[in-house]
């Protein structure tokens, strides 16, 4: 089972001003806690978090790590709306991701054990991925720069199997926890 903990503080105003909401675990609806859905700055005290622009963990996702985010335009130029968040489950230090060119784990396969800013630098010639196999937890970004459009890849969100079990799911344009193509 994944360990999910941490602390994130959301602020209504830029540069950590205005009403604030401190969150220590899953928060499926900010309005239920008396906080409007406008978030202009964030302080991640501990853990990594996935934040969603709609309640109930839906919509565009933002992966935020430890640190300060004083102005939403620096991490989300689309909108200051945010409706829910949850800590990213951690299975320790072990993570592995395999991407496949074809459906059902066929075709060219590329394995990742660490951060990689460009698929092409690792020999991936296609502009899409059809199948992803995840061992542990991770995050991916599209297009080519870290932090552009991001989505979470997590076995802990798919099953309660141990970290050694892989979650396998075909990549489509909008599966539950993947919001963009690679």
From Swiss-Prot:
The keyword Electron transport does not apply. This is Gamma-crystallin N. It comes from Homo sapiens. Residues 6-46, 47-89, 95-136 form the Beta/gamma crystallin 'Greek key' domain. Residues 153-182 are annotated as: Disordered. Keywords: Repeat. Pfam families: Crystall (PF00030). Residues 169-182 have a biased composition (Polar residues).
């Amino acid at each position: 089972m994944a360990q999910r903990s941490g602390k994130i503080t959301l602020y209504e105003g830029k540069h950590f001003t205005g009403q604030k909401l401190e969150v220590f675990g899953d928060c499926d609806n900010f309005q239920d806690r008396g906080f409007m859905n406008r978030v202009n700055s964030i302080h991640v005290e501990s853990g990594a978090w996935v934040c969603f622009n709609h309640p109930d963990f839906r919509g565009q996702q933002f992966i935020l790590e430890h640190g300060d985010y004083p102005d939403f335009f620096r991490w989300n130029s689309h909108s200051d709306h945010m409706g829910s968040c949850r800590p990213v489950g951690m299975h320790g230090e072990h993570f592995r991701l395999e991407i496949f060119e074809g459906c059902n784990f066929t075709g060219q396969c590329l394995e990742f054990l660490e951060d990689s800013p460009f698929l092409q630098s690792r020999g991936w010639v296609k502009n899409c991925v059809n199948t992803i196999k995840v061992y542990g937890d991770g995050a991916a970004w599209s297009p080519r720069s870290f932090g552009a459009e991001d989505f979470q890849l997590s076995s802990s969100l798919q099953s309660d199997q141990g970290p050694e079990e892989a979650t396998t799911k075909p990549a489509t344009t909008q599966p539950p926890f993947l919001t963009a193509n690679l």
